[in-house]
């Protein structure tokens, strides 16, 4: 076969194959064009999820008859100066979208330039039969796409069910709407309105907050930390969820570069690293984060759909994003998810409903540490005992009160007013601390709370020095289930030594331990080594030092913490509460589970119909 030139229509169909995968791709390209046209209102109408009909209407600057003719040709654009290719601020710039869409559909464009006397219309079928006529239309542009992929039936066969395609389109519109809170958006499918977002005209932070409430939900804002981070050539703003408000997938993570929605691996990894101290590995935070960067420091022309970008200095961007998120979470302090109390109240109302707890939608109740009950001796006596109340040796066992609280004194009342977690009143099942504030009761999981405190304490030690070791009077021999786990620990023995653990191989499946970190106190060495082996065996020899430290610190913290089932004095309970108040992110343990739940008095009154 001889070499020959492809026809213009064939070239456009090939280009469409790269850019237009489904109806959502068409909506994305056309809505982005409307945004670039300085629109304040964009309406989207779909039939059969866009397979039969897509209509995009805007009130933007519009086009003249000459501009209409040029707009449907390949590589024509009004959006940037080709001499300034490194300074792209618009969504589109390649000039491929309209001709590519026209090549695989029946397209009708009607447009009227602002302050013009006439509107014009152009009709294309499969990219051909271009004819401009005079029409009637308001200022702006309306684009109708019918019978998508009629010219490429093979692509049509690969489309998913209407529901799936519609979900993808709604997701696209939501992302663009989040980035442009001043623009009004509406989305109608088969006559039913799915989205109606009113444009906001207040200050930037208020506009963004309201648009996030409209798109993601009010619950997210209530359980999110605000990000406001700036450097001379870089700024990050947005919201990211508290660790206890999380999901089982990353679908609710909205990331933007210069208002362009992206699904960039670098940013996703940075987000993961920022939360690694607070979330189990199978849980994901929710976020809407906007990065503004000098266009010359980022290349948006590396992906056909512009979904990925390339940074001039990726490590710099990664580290800044991690720092921005951690700063925001630290400022959120020990606050836990506000939805948890509501879920608990629902459980009270429907105690016999045999279904998954709504709490499990927010937190990871299946994490490895969820049911962990260490048998080690508490090191709680190292906690500062400032501002403690008079001893209240009130213990609740099996949900029945054994002894009423007596001798309420003025100091306790001051404690309730002064401290967010209030004054300890009792202990439930020797596992949960009940405390009282001015307008609520707080239920604290003593093991999860102390595990978080221990985690932060051990991290602080590791930042400045090696952990102090204590030599075991009698070395401990730990037999592991298989040789792989024993080898894994032995392979990391030098790194573990710096983390306070001295061990050697003892036979095929056993490890002999001679020194442990002093901070762990009277720890169960057998359980410690077994848990550590479980953590590390999945990663083998190639685990990075930072990941190794993370796993070891998690394991140490779990064994450092006070056990469920141990009775605490009022002084110990109050000391734990005070230290929680002074520790950032103490509202959740290392796996994203809440360390405490607060029930407001008004919520309790609702339970009793008051």
Curated annotation (Swiss-Prot):
Keywords: DNA damage, DNA repair
Designated name of the protein: DNA mismatch repair protein MutL
InterPro entries xrefs: DNA_mismatch_repair_CS, DNA_mismatch_repair_MutL, DNA_mismatch_S5_2-like, HATPase_C_sf, MutL/Mlh/PMS, MutL/Mlh/Pms-like, MutL_C, MutL_C_dimsub
Entry's family note: Belongs to the DNA mismatch repair MutL/HexB family.
HAMAP family the record matches: DNA_mis_repair
Purpose: This protein is involved in the repair of mismatches in DNA. It is required for dam-dependent methyl-directed DNA mismatch repair. May act as a 'molecular matchmaker', a protein that promotes the formation of a stable complex between two or more DNA-binding proteins in an ATP-dependent manner without itself being part of a final effector complex.
Name of the gene: mutL
GO BP annotations listed: mismatch repair
GO cellular component, one term: mismatch repair complex
GO molecular function: ATP binding; ATP hydrolysis activity; ATP-dependent DNA damage sensor activity; mismatched DNA binding
């Amino acid at each position: 076969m001889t070499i020959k030139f492809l026809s213009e229509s064939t070239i456009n169909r090939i280009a469409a194959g790269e850019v237009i995968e489904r109806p959502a791709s068409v909506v994305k390209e056309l809505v982005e064009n409307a945004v670039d046209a300085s629109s304040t209102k964009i309406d989207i109408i779909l039939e059969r999820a866009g397979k039969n009909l897509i209509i995009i209407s805007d009130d933007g600057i519009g086009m003249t008859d000459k501009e209409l003719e040029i707009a449907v040709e390949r590589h024509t654009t009004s959006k940037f100066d080709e001499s300034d290719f490194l300074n792209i601020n618009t969504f589109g710039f390649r000039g491929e979208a309209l001709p590519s869409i026209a090549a695989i559909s029946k397209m009708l464009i009607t447009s009227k330039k602002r302050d013009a006397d006439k509107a014009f219309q152009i009709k294309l079928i499969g990219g051909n039969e271009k004819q401009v006529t005079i029409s009637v239309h308001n200022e702006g542009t309306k684009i109708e796409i019918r019978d998508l992929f009629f010219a490429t039936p093979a692509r049509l066969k690969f489309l998913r069910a209407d529901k799936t395609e519609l979900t993808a389109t709604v997701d696209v519109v939501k992302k663009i709407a989040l980035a442009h809170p001043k623009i009004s958006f509406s989305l109608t499918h088969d006559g039913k309105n799915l989205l109606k977002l009113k444009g906001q005209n207040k200050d930037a932070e208020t506009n963004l907050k309201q648009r996030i409430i409209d798109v993601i939900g009010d619950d997210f804002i209530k359980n999110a930390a605000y990000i406001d981070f700036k450097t001379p050539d870089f700024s990050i703003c947005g919201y990211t969820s508290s660790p206890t408000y999380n999901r089982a997938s990353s679908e609710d993570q909205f990331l933007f570069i210069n208002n362009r929605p992206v699904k960039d691996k670098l940013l996703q990894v940075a987000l993961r690293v920022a939360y690694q101290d607070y979330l189990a590995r199978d849980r994901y935070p929710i976020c809407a984060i906007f990065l503004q960067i000098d266009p010359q420091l980022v290349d948006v022309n590396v992906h056909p759909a512009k979904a990925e970008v390339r940074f001039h200095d990726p490590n710099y961007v990664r580290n800044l994003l991690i720092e921005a998120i951690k700063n925001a979470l630290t400022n959120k302090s020990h606050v836990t998810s506000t939805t948890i109390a509501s879920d608990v109240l629902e459980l009270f109302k429907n105690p016999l409903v045999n279904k998954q707890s709504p709490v499990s939608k927010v937190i990871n109740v299946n994490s490895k540490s969820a049911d962990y009950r260490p048998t080690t001796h508490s090191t709680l006596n190292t906690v500062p005992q400032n501002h403690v109340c008079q001893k209240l040796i009130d213990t609740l066992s099996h949900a029945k009160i054994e002894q009423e609280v007596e001798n309420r004194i003025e100091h306790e009342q001051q404690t309730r007013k002064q401290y967010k977690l209030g004054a300890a009143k009792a202990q439930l099942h020797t596992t949960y601390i009940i405390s009282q504030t001015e307008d609520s009761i707080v239920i604290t999981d003593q093991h999860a709370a102390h595990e978080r405190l221990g985690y932060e304490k051990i991290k602080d030690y590791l930042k400045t020095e090696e952990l102090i070791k204590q030599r075991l009077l009698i070395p401990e021999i730990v037999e592991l289930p298989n040789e792989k786990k024993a080898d894994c620990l032995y392979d990391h023995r030098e790194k573990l030594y710096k983390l306070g653990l001295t061990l050697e191989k003892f036979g095929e499946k056993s490890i002999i331990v001679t020194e442990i970190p002093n901070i762990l106190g009277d720890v169960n060495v057998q359980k410690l080594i077994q848990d550590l082996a479980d953590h590390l065996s999945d990663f083998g020899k190639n685990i990075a030092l930072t990941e190794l430290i993370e796993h070891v610190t998690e394991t140490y913290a779990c064994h450092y913490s006070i056990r469920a089932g141990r009775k605490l004095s009022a002084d110990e309970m109050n000391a734990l509460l005070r230290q929680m108040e002074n520790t950032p992110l103490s509202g959740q343990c290392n796996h994203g589970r809440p360390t405490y739940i607060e029930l407001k008095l008004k919520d309790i009154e609702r339970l009793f119909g008051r």
